[in-house]
């Protein structure tokens, strides 16, 4: 055995390749061993270092792969099981154990995370050269008993099923011990590169090969100073020196130092200064400004900015002649940067390769299996069924059929297998084609119902049923169609998923064989196997930026290296033990077992491993290195790593460069990036004045960019402070509103127009509606209460009111419409009870009807031949609506209008003046259409009746009598009343001066109401609808005002100038704010002024 070490700036690969070539020259077959994470990259590096650039006698591989070469043709006793099959076997074993048999893990024995932890521990025990029996040394008796029982049962299942899940290295070791491979080992040599520790299994294999006379060369990075040091704790090279010293002691070999002949570079001098800091010695070298220029420390605000600055720098280097393959990008946290990496690097048109496997979880086939599993487990929940259909690989529904089906399922709130098994019957005014929907339902449900009828049966029987199901679901045809327009790379990914799917089913058949399995367990196992599968990823081309985690980097990896995301939280990475065995358990097992057996204790390796990783990172570049840390990662504040801060301390004294937008050619990455940056600079406030040079630069850049975009026919969308709408064409207006027909309006249409003109366009012209639902809503609640009161008032008034109310409630509850609405679920029953309480409370007001009789309910107006008003061009305008109730005053026959409200509503002169509260005046005008009525006579008022359960806070009252009075105040008719009729009205009518009108004032009110309708009619017929939601205070838009942001793009902070300001009283004309009668007169006078214009 030969042990070698060299300075970190001396390429260890070159040294070891030279050793390998000399071994080949003596007739040896050389296996060049690298760690799993580096084997692919190491193969390329070895080939580059070979004098002949290739050699059949040198194989670059991993320990496990090398062992496979020797056992490939071995006739193994059992069937091979991979991790997926092993997981299934553990699952099967655990289901056969009763919950009571496992004192600690009984309740989580089927949990996928627990099964994964058991698999990890199984492999870890193999790697550590330990057996399941060694778990007997655990201290906690219940935990010990459970783990021993589980693994004993797993071992029994492996033997009984003739399965083999042993590692390749263990099998190879058995062959070495038996002497089967002596002839092959005679010409074998090993060169081992990139390790600072061996697992117990790897160490055992190296020992066996050494004893068989195999030549072994092991190399690592370390300085002579570190190796000779008596005290190594805390040294940067502690991990590699400890590794060397242990091997030297075990094999009685003295490590050889390989001197570095070339002159020391900047990174070598910086490394020596850092090493001196950690071993508390004086640095023997000085760092110059030239040295400092080769290592930069960046500080940025967030990940996005950090990646953008890296992208710009890469583009600049490429412009200067650097190849993408000469650049390496390292992440402190790959997960945190992965999504933004694709967005930004695509924007800057930088090809890259992220060297990590990708989960198949988002593939339609995996989602197909997941949806099936959830449908069975949760009994056909709506979202699970829709997710299955939206995978695009189930059934033969067209997109239009799927949309129609989904709309109905959401409308009728179809959940559960029972509802989906029955024909759909619920409808809303015939809006849905039930025959078509039921045909779709049968096509969707038939395969699922047939498959889910499967009970516990053998694995072969279950797989046969599953095969029938996927054929009925046209899975294969749909997957084939999915591939039609995909790229070659995507087609390969689809093939990988199908292979993984088939392999999972094969492993299931192999593990369970003739065992009985429940359908739920089958689907859970298939899903678990699919989620464990990953895509194989290989770079599409050689000339790409290699992207990886910083802890996988080697010294001298690339000429230019960018390491970003190096915050204190992520650099260094603190390995955490999340296994079933604690660090104390591991230490106890290590002490109790053979010296060749050892479980890794991550916490004990953290410090020396992290220091060595940091040193490797500092030496990863051959020309320039950039280390960067953002202030925010995933919107969470973090600080710069202490390793980076150490570089800023004397004598290194590296400056921290705070990256900001700059105006120079270095800041341009590509046309896409330049476009993005110009828009960004245009939108954001600039925190400093631009110099003349910067202004000139951006002016020229914009001109060049515009020419480029114009040549390609691309326009830049303008973000304007003004939202403009297109007017309707005359042909459209004529089709919507023929001149020979009156323009039909309503009080609600009037209010909608004045709230936001574009809202009227959306609701009344485009006819867009909110999603329908079968569940009772505010409208159905109102109809329910209206129906009760209608029946009460139609009954014989000589009967007791409470009896009439009970009869009306009973009859209304039994009506088909309301019975289906309010008997569907416990929630709807509870809602009905609240409505009945409201009906009884409101009924107390109806009971006090002395001097009043009801002569009409749900009375429709606006159907008479006489129009509501005539426009100046002779166009007729009619106003339609429905009055909840018309009352007659017995004293003189005058009429009044009642409108039921489910919430507190009051008449407001200000809102009426601005067109937002015209309901009551419109109803008063409508009464005049009734036969025998003269304008402005025989009216006593228009009012709201609040249909709610009155609530009074007792803390606001002094005694119980006050609470009763407060309740009485809330249960009153509130609205507009004629002053000369107030004496004839009872106590249930709110009598206030502000809402008491004279006949003359009523006439002004109704005349102004016509003006409002005239403005709306003229605006609609003009065909132009502004985006102008109203603002009450001129500072913001109230949350209850529809802004339709998703359609219009309206943003209050940008477009508030377009909002309609409400007209208000000029308070400067009054000594103090008017109230009561003065307030009424002020608004009536303002209306007169408008009428006189």
UniProtKB/Swiss-Prot annotation:
<keyword id="KW-0347">Helicase</keyword>
<keyword id="KW-0067">ATP-binding</keyword>
<keyword id="KW-0547">Nucleotide-binding</keyword>
<dbReference type="InterPro" id="IPR011335">
    <property type="entry name" value="Restrct_endonuc-II-like"/>
</dbReference>
<dbReference type="InterPro" id="IPR014141">
    <property type="entry name" value="DNA_helicase_suRexB"/>
</dbReference>
<comment type="similarity">
    <text>Belongs to the helicase family. AddB/RexB type 2 subfamily.</text>
</comment>
<dbReference type="GO" id="GO:0004386">
    <property type="term" value="F:helicase activity"/>
</dbReference>
<dbReference type="InterPro" id="IPR038726">
    <property type="entry name" value="PDDEXK_AddAB-type"/>
</dbReference>
<dbReference type="GO" id="GO:0008409">
    <property type="term" value="F:5'-3' exonuclease activity"/>
</dbReference>
<keyword id="KW-0238">DNA-binding</keyword>
<dbReference type="InterPro" id="IPR027417">
    <property type="entry name" value="P-loop_NTPase"/>
</dbReference>
<protein>
    <recommendedName>
        <fullName>ATP-dependent helicase/deoxyribonuclease subunit B</fullName>
        <ecNumber>3.1.-.-</ecNumber>
    </recommendedName>
</protein>
<keyword id="KW-0378">Hydrolase</keyword>
<dbReference type="InterPro" id="IPR049035">
    <property type="entry name" value="ADDB_N"/>
</dbReference>
<comment type="subunit">
    <text>Heterodimer of AddA and RexB.</text>
</comment>
<keyword id="KW-0227">DNA damage</keyword>
<keyword id="KW-0234">DNA repair</keyword>
<dbReference type="GO" id="GO:0003690">
    <property type="term" value="F:double-stranded DNA binding"/>
</dbReference>
<dbReference type="GO" id="GO:0005524">
    <property type="term" value="F:ATP binding"/>
</dbReference>
<comment type="function">
    <text>The heterodimer acts as both an ATP-dependent DNA helicase and an ATP-dependent, dual-direction single-stranded exonuclease. Recognizes the chi site generating a DNA molecule suitable for the initiation of homologous recombination. This subunit has 5' -&gt; 3' nuclease activity but not helicase activity.</text>
</comment>
<dbReference type="GO" id="GO:0000724">
    <property type="term" value="P:double-strand break repair via homologous recombination"/>
</dbReference>
<keyword id="KW-0269">Exonuclease</keyword>
<keyword id="KW-0540">Nuclease</keyword>
<dbReference type="Pfam" id="PF21445">
    <property type="entry name" value="ADDB_N"/>
</dbReference>
<dbReference type="GO" id="GO:0016817">
    <property type="term" value="F:hydrolase activity, acting on acid anhydrides"/>
</dbReference>
<dbReference type="Pfam" id="PF12705">
    <property type="entry name" value="PDDEXK_1"/>
</dbReference>
């Amino acid at each position: 055995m030969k042990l070698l070490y060299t300075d970190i700036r001396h390429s260890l690969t070159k040294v070891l390749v030279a050793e390998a070539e000399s071994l080949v020259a003596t007739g040896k077959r050389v296996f060049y061993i690298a760690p799993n994470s580096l084997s692919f990259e190491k193969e390329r590096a070895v080939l580059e270092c070979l004098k002949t650039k290739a050699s059949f006698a040198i194989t670059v591989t991993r320990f496990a792969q090398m062992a496979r070469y020797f056992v490939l043709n071995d006739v193994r006793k059992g069937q091979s099981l991979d991790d997926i099959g092993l997981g299934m076997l553990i699952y099967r074993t655990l289901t056969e154990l009763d919950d009571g048999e496992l004192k600690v893990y009984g309740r989580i024995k089927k949990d996928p995370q627990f099964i994964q932890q058991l698999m990890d521990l199984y492999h870890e025990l193999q790697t550590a050269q330990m057996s399941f029996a060694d778990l007997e040394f655990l201290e906690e008796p219940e935990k010990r008993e459970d783990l021993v029982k589980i693994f004993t049962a797993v071992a029994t299942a492996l033997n009984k099923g003739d399965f083999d899940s042993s590692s390749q290295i263990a099998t190879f070791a058995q062959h070495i011990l038996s002497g089967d491979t002596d002839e092959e080992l005679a010409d074998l040599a090993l060169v081992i590169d990139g390790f600072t520790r061996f697992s117990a299994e790897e160490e055992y294999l190296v020992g066996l090969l050494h004893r068989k006379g195999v030549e072994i060369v092991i190399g690592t990075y370390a300085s002579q100073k570190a190796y000779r040091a008596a005290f190594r704790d805390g040294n940067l090279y502690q991990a590699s020196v400890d590794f060397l010293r242990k091997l030297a002691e075990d094999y009685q070999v003295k490590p050889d130092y390989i001197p570095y002949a070339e002159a020391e570079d900047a990174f070598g001098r910086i490394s020596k200064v850092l090493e001196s800091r950690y071993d508390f010695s004086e640095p023997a070298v000085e760092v110059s400004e030239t040295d400092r220029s080769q290592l930069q420390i960046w500080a940025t605000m967030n990940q996005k900015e950090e990646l953008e600055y890296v992208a710009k720098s890469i583009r600049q280097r490429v412009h200067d002649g650097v190849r993408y393959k000469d650049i390496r990008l390292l992440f402190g946290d790959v997960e945190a940067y992965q999504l933004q990496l694709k967005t930004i690097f695509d924007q800057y048109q930088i090809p890259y390769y992220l060297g990590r496997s990708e989960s198949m979880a988002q593939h339609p086939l995996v989602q197909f299996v997941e949806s099936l599993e959830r449908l069975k487990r949760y009994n056909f929940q709506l979202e699970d069924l829709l997710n299955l259909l939206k995978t695009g690989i189930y059934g033969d529904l067209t997109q239009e059929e799927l949309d129609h089906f989904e709309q109905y399922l959401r409308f009728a709130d179809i959940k559960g297998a029972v509802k989906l098994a029955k024909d759909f019957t619920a409808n809303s005014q015939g809006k849905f084609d039930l025959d078509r929907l039921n045909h779709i339902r049968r096509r969707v449900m038939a395969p699922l119902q047939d498959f889910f009828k499967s009970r516990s049966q053998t694995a072969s029987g279950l797989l046969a049923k599953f095969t029938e199901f996927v054929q009925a679901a046209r899975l294969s045809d749909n997957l084939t169609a999915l591939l039609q327009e995909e790229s070659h790379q995507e087609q390969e990914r689809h093939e990988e998923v199908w292979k993984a799917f088939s392999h999972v089913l094969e492993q299931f058949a192999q593990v369970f064989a003739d065992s009985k399995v429940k359908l739920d367990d089958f689907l859970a196992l298939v899903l678990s196997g699919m989620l464990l599968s990953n895509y194989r990823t290989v770079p599409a081309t050689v000339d790409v930026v290699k992207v990886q985690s910083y802890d996988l980097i080697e010294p001298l990896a690339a000429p230019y290296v960018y390491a970003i995301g190096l915050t204190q939280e992520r650099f260094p990475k603190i390995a955490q033990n999340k296994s079933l065995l604690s660090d104390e358990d591991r230490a106890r097992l290590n002490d109790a077992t053979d010296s060749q057996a050892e479980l890794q204790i991550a916490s004990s390796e953290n410090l020396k491993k992290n220091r060595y990783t940091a040193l490797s990172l500092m030496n990863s570049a051959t020309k320039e290195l950039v280390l960067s840390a953002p202030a925010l990662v995933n919107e969470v504040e973090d600080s710069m790593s202490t390793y980076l801060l150490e570089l800023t301390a004397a004598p290194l004294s590296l400056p921290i460069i705070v990256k900001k937008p700059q105006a120079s050619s270095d800041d341009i990455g590509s046309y896409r990036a330049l476009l993005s940056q110009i828009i960004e600079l245009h939108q954001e406030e600039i925190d400093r004045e631009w110099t003349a040079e910067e202004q000139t630069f951006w002016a020229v850049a914009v001109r060049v960019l515009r020419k480029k975009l114009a040549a390609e026919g691309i326009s830049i969308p303008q973000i304007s402070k003004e939202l403009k709408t297109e007017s309707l064409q005359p042909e459209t207006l004529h089709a919507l509103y023929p001149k020979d027909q009156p323009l039909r309006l309503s009080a609600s249409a009037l209010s909608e127009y004045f709230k936001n003109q574009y809202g009227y366009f959306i609701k009344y012209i485009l006819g867009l509606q909110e999603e329908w639902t079968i569940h009772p809503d505010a409208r159905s609640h109102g109809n329910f209460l209206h129906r009760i009161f209608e029946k009460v008032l139609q009954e014989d008034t000589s009967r007791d009111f409470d009896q009439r109310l009970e009869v009306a409630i009973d009859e209304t509850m039994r009506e088909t419409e309301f019975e289906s609405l309010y008997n569907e679920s416990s929630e709807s029953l509870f809602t009905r009870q609240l409505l009945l309480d409201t009906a009884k409370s409101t009924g107390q007001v109806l009971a006090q009807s002395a001097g009043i009789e009801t002569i009409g309910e749900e009375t429709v107006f606006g159907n008479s031949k006489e129009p509501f008003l005539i426009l100046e061009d002779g166009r007729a305008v009619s106003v339609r609506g429905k009055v909840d109730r018309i009352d007659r005053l017995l004293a003189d026959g005058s009429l009044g209008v009642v409108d039921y409200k489910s919430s507190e509503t009051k008449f407001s002169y200000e809102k009426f003046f601005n067109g937002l509260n015209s309901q009551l005046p419109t109803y008063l005008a409508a009464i005049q259409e009734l036969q025998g009525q003269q304008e402005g006579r025989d009216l006593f008022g228009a009012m709201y009746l609040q249909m709610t359960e009155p609530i009074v806070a007792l803390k606001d009252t002094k005694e119980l009598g006050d609470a009763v009075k407060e309740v009485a105040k809330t249960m009153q008719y509130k609205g507009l009343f004629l002053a000369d009729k107030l004496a004839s009205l009872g106590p249930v009518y709110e009598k206030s001066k502000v809402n008491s009108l004279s006949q003359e004032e009523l006439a002004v009110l109704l005349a102004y109401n016509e003006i409002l309708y005239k403005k709306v009619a003229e605006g609609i017929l003009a065909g132009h609808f502004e985006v102008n939601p109203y603002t009450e205070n001129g500072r913001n838009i109230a949350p209850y005002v529809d802004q339709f942001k998703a359609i219009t793009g309206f943003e209050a902070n940008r477009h508030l100038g377009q909002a309609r300001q409400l007209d208000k009283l000029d308070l400067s004309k009054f000594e103090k704010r008017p109230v009561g009668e003065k307030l009424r007169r002020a608004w009536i006078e303002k209306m007169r002024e408008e009428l006189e214009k």
